[in-house]
Amino acid sequence: MANTYSALKRVRQTERRTEVNRKNKTRLRHQIRAMRRAITAKDVKVAGELLPVTFSVIDRSAKSGIIKKNTAARYKSKLHLRVKALAA
């Protein structure tokens, strides 16, 4: 248990940040999962509509440090390639 006021404050801040990060990571995973489901179902229209939304969620996650920049680029690249192949 934290003994000083500043240590208690850091514990509170950490708990708050952990909760925010958990929600953002969950949102990211759900969005990518929905995108992959649309691709698997070969639904070009839905995949096309979800692509910009998914990219936005990925970019925000990378910006806030939920995932690394290169991981975000890799996710976006793979999803874009699959949607492009689906549309062709």
Curated annotation (Swiss-Prot):
A cellular component term, taken from the record's GO annotations: cytosol
Keywords from the named record: Ribonucleoprotein, Ribosomal protein, RNA-binding, rRNA-binding
Residues annotated as transmembrane: none
GO molecular function terms noted in the UniProt entry: small ribosomal subunit rRNA binding; structural constituent of ribosome
Matches recorded under InterPro entries: Ribosomal_bS20 (IPR002583), Ribosomal_bS20_sf (IPR036510)
A biological-process GO annotation: translation
Source organism superkingdom: Bacteria
HAMAP family (alphabetical): Ribosomal_bS20 (MF_00500)
Family that this chain belongs to: Belongs to the bacterial ribosomal protein bS20 family.
Role according to the record: Binds directly to 16S ribosomal RNA.
Name used for this protein in its record: Small ribosomal subunit protein bS20
Annotated organism of origin: Solibacter usitatus (strain Ellin6076)
